[in-house]
Swiss-Prot record:
Residues 336-349 have a biased composition (Acidic residues). Residues 1-122 are annotated as: Interaction with DDIT3/CHOP. GO terms for molecular function: ATP binding; enzyme binding; mitogen-activated protein kinase kinase binding; protein kinase binding; protein serine/threonine kinase inhibitor activity; transcription corepressor activity; ubiquitin ligase activator activity; ubiquitin protein ligase binding. The gene is Trib3. It is found in: Nucleus. The keyword Transcription regulation applies. Induction: Expression induced during programmed cell death evoked in neuronal cells by NGF-depletion. Residues 63-310 form the Protein kinase domain. This is Tribbles homolog 3.
Amino acid sequence: MRATSLAASADVPCRKKPLEFDDNIDVECPVLKRVRDEPEPGPTPSLPPASDLSPAVAPATRLGPYILLEREQGNCTYRALHCPTGTEYTCKVYPASEAQAVLAPYARLPTHQHVARPTEVLLGSQLLYTFFTKTHGDLHSLVRSRRGIPEPEAAALFRQMASAVAHCHKHGLILRDLKLRRFVFSNCERTKLVLENLEDACVMTGPDDSLWDKHACPAYVGPEILSSRPSYSGRAADVWSLGVALFTMLAGRYPFQDSEPALLFGKIRRGTFALPEGLSASARCLIRCLLRREPSERLVALGILLHPWLREDCSQVSPPRSDRREMDQVVPDGPQLEEAEEGEVGLYG
């Protein structure tokens, strides 16, 4: 799902906060290696399906110990095969001129079990190649296929999501454009999540997390981004997006939806939504704590992990199916449809 520019919905010109870099570099960030041969990757005919991959597959584009195969999604993501081990990876390709901006978030961020990071980085004369461990689908697809997730399962997954976001915020990364698709499963049982695509994150150099960028996914954008304010809190905007994600996981639909963008943005600005019946009191409380119109009233990411819903046993509660039958309200299939639809101390900050 692509993010959509929202500058037209505000009276303020869109200004992206420039990335600034300092010496706070993570020693565990993969070392950037240079490669000599660099053919342009492209589609290759008659490639076998992923399940049939083996080291004997005819090469498409050779890059050091890797073979780049066909595109996976978008214009810069490819399947890749590590020839010595036969292990399949995902390779993201960028212009070499963008290397500093692409790698800066990973250099800043210490390793975390719920944040994906490149296993290897190769730099050619024109292109940058980042290799990631293969994943097993994204959370958006799971929610759509099941039209919502029972509370116990949702709590286990959302705890991982909040942990990843809290880790990023602690180390000065504002994620922006948070959505279910950015959380992917690292195991085939689909119980462990990692946050991917840190390339677009803003790297902050101090406590001020003000942003001017009006670029976001319509379904997940916070009301303050749609307002005429010249800037907004990046961390609070990320928390709003987490609230939208949690609501969608439990209800199987977005809290704010309309086929007309102007009407959708109006609903988001008003900040009124109807919680589905059947949710536990603590789940309803957490959603309301995240989807507050006033950014300063929302939980901070670390505070989410302290909320009772993530600490109690909600195994006896599951969202009703009756609220998920309206086809115009379910999570849409594919990025095009989704884009169109689109009191304890320390809890607050």
